[in-house]
């Protein structure tokens, strides 16, 4: 247990500096704006929506079905709201638990010694894990890894207890349940069933490729055949259910998410997809350059066979095949019988093979292994003979490295990223085992004490460097500004664009504008960046420039409803009402199919209809305005704030002298937002009109109480007082209104008019 505890402690300690971090990048959509986390949303919605809160069967859904992760976010939200500390704490604790389980699994393969300790420490400290642990949405990968390892350890127990029917099938049931839970944390968790099969065939039974089919067909190995068959059946069932639940359709992604998938060139797609695993392996070997996002042009396409990066591809697959060949072609297997190894004339109790004496003598360094002697036989020999050979571990390590990574290779369907560091969380287990078993083999191979010490200190140094890099990289995840600045050299377009949003929120307008323009320099057709720059210019009254960028954004993405919305608002304010009307109408007709964020799209469409209704209202077309408002109410999403829409409905009914309907919608507006000032003023006017003077005055006074700095509130109250012939009080209200809103022509003009009435009287 010491190795497990120490490794877990290191995993915990290295990420303590993330507890003070804020929400970053994808955390915003998955947590801060995800309606599935709110208490008013039925918790069952989690099982019908994707990771980002979109209905799983929607054409624009990401199809990432991770209900257990979303459920953990909801529990976090219920306990601590939107305090990021508690979310980060759960991530760190999960990583520590996964590290302990990985170390425990390593002990099954490497024994209770230095090499297990090394594997655990390497996994705890590997910098590739920073995105999964420091980024809160990475919890999906960490949680999937937890149940991945639990499933694998259950299967190890299942193999070692064969012959005890109740116990062995109890462990198998645990394998299946944990595999299902792993998949419900993240899709790649289901691959643990394939890794379990590899363990059973190549590690537990130590079969060679040519022995597999003959062996599983023999009566003596029916248990192996049954186990593999059940693993296959359960894996197929889980995948079938997963595909059915997401509507039997793959997700659709934009060109910027995965440029290779959108390339017209078969050669470019093929060369790039073959190269990407090489790039991922390099990130595991040398995690010097890490980024929050590897989309767009972060990894340029390989368009010709002359691209020098193809040499990396050839070297990678050659090395992979060589490793697999060496692992599968083991001369010591010749003495096997039906997949069962024989040691000292007796079958091994757990089915593991015997090793050569040289390997046993050198595979572990700890003197404690040779300490206790009973009946003239060293216990260490008994323990060591139960460990798999180096070749076995290589095969299992390769399966851990490759199989969980297969869903990210674009082999079966296109994915929405070029590289994703957090996807490497589970494959890194295989990588850490490969490095460890390689170091162990090298340690055994060399004879000189100096060289053995060199291997020992080299591995220790690697772990130290990994730990230092992890601690430093965690600093980049403290807040979004630091994170995006760190990603500029890898993905400048995305990093500059996101940095512009952060700088704008900090009111650093000129810096934000420069950041947006830098992003567009690297990728000029980014609709979101064009829109964001237009919005910044609009907010700074540079309307002509803003319109230019909104039109460019619409040209780049004709379905960008928010660009239509702001274009229409500018045109309406410029008096170009007919052009504004056409813009709002066009926006309202855009469907939400194949859109990443249909909720945001629906909000923009609803806002367009609201503004179109206001346009009709200002032109005196109240019936048309009501018709548009009703359409807006039908289309608005759950998260849309409807108080202004309801208030305008009431205004339209009031202008049509339909006072009961007007009162209904004013009350609806106040119910949806009790401190909505316009509804207090309009409802107060209706109450005064219907003779409920005292109630009306209360609403006017409440509006003033809600915002004492708003001159318009005093103006409406003054008008009410004037109608009640309370001239002195009305004059005071008019004077206050003019002082507070001295730049508003309507307020000053009405105040002057009201102040003149007492003089005339």
What are the language-model segments listed below?
Residues 489, 520-521, 552-555, 586-589, ...:
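Conserved structural position within tetratricopeptide repeats
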Residues 491, 525, 559, 597-600, ...:
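Structural signature of alpha-solenoid helical repeat junctions
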Residues 496-503, 515, 529-540, 549, ...:
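TPR/Sel1-like alpha-solenoid repeat signature
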Residues 1-575, 592, 604-606, 611, ...:
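Polytopic membrane enzymes that build or remodel cell-surface glycoconjugates and lipids
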Residues 584-592, 731-745, 756, 761:
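TPR/TPR-like (Sel1-like) alpha-helical repeat modules
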């Amino acid at each position: 247990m010491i190795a497990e505890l120490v490794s877990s402690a290191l995993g915990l300690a290295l990420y303590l500096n993330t507890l003070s971090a804020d929400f970053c990048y994808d955390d915003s959509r998955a947590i801060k704006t995800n309606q599935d986390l709110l208490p008013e949303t039925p918790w069952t919605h989690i099982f019908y929506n994707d990771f980002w809160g979109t209905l799983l069967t929607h054409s624009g859904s990401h199809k990432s079905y991770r209900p257990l992760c979303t459920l953990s976010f909801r529990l976090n939200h219920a306990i601590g709201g939107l305090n990021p500390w508690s979310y980060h704490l759960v991530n760190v604790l999960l990583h520590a638990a996964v590290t302990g389980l990985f170390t425990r699994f390593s002990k099954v393969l490497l024994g209770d010694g230095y090499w297990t300790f090394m594997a655990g420490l390497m996994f705890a400290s590997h910098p590739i894990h920073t995105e999964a642990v420091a980024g809160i949405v990475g919890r999906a990968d960490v949680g999937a890894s937890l149940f991945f390892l639990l499933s694998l350890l259950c299967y190890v127990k299942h193999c070692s207890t064969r012959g005890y029917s109740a116990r062995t099938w109890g462990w198998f049931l645990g394998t299946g349940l944990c595999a299902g839970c792993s998949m419900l944390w993240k899709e790649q968790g289901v691959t643990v069933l394939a890794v379990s099969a590899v363990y059973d065939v190549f590690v537990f039974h130590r079969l060679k490729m040519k022995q597999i089919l003959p062996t599983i067909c023999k009566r003596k190995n029916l248990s192996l055949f049954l186990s593999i068959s059940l693993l296959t059946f359960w894996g197929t069932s889980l995948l079938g259910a997963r595909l059915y639940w997401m509507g039997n359709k793959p997700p659709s992604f934009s060109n910027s998410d995965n440029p290779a998938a959108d390339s017209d060139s078969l050669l470019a797609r093929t060369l790039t997809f073959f190269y990407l695993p090489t790039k991922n392996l390099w990130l595991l070997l040398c995690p010097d350059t890490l980024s929050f996002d590897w989309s767009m042009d972060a990894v340029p396409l390989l368009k010709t066979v002359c691209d020098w990066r193809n040499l990396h591809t050839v070297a990678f697959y050659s090395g992979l095949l060589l490793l697999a060949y060496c692992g599968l072609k083991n001369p010591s297997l010749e003495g096997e019988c039906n997949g069962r190894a024989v040691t000292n004339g007796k079958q091994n109790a757990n089915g593991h093979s015997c090793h050569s004496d040289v390997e046993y003598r050198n595979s572990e360094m700890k003197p404690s292994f040779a300490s206790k002697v009973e009946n003239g036989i060293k216990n260490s020999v008994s323990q060591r003979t139960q460990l798999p050979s180096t070749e076995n571990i290589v095969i299992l390590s390769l399966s851990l490295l490759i199989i969980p990574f297969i869903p990210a290779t674009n082999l079966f369907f296109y994915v929405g990223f070029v590289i994703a560091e957090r996807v490497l969380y589970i494959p890194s287990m295989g990588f850490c085992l490969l490095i460890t078993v390689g170091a162990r083999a090298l340690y055994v191979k060399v004879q000189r004490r100096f060289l053995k010490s060199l291997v020992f200190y080299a591995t220790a140094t690697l772990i130290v460097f990994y730990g230092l890099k992890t601690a430093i990289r965690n600093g980049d995840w403290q807040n979004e500004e630091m994170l995006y600045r760190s990603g500029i050299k890898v993905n400048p377009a995305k990093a500059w664009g996101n940095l512009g949003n952060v700088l704008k929120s900090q009111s650093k307008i000129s810096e934000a504008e420069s950041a947006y323009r830098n992003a567009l320099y690297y990728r000029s057709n980014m609709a979101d960046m064009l829109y964001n720059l237009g919005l910044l210019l609009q907010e700074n009254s540079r309307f002509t420039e803003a319109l230019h960028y909104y039109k460019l954004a619409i040209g780049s993405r004709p379905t960008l409803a928010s660009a239509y919305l702001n274009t229409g608002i500018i045109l309406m304010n410029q008096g170009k009402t007919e052009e504004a009307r056409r813009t709002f109408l066009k926006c309202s007709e855009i469907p939400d199919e194949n859109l990443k964020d249909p909720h945001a799209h629906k909000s923009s469409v609803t806002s367009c209809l609201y503004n179109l209704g206001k346009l009709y209202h200002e032109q005196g077309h109240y019936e048309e305005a009501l018709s548009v408002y009703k359409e807006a109410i039908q289309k608005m999403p759950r998260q849309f704030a409807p108080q202004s829409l309801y208030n305008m409905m009431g205004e339209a009914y009031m202008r049509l002298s339909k006072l009961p309907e007007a009162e209904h919608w004013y009350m609806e507006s106040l119910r949806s937002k009790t401190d909505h000032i316009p509804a207090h003023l309009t409802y107060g006017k209706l109450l005064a009109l219907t003779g409920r003077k005292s109630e009306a005055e209360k609403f006017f006074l409440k509006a003033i109480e809600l915002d004492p700095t708003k001159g318009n509130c005093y103006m409406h109250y003054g008008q009410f007082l004037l109608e009640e012939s309370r001239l002195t009080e009305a004059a005071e209200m008019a004077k206050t209104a003019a002082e507070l809103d001295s730049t508003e022509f309507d307020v000053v003009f009405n105040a002057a008019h009201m102040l003149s009435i007492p003089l005339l009287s």
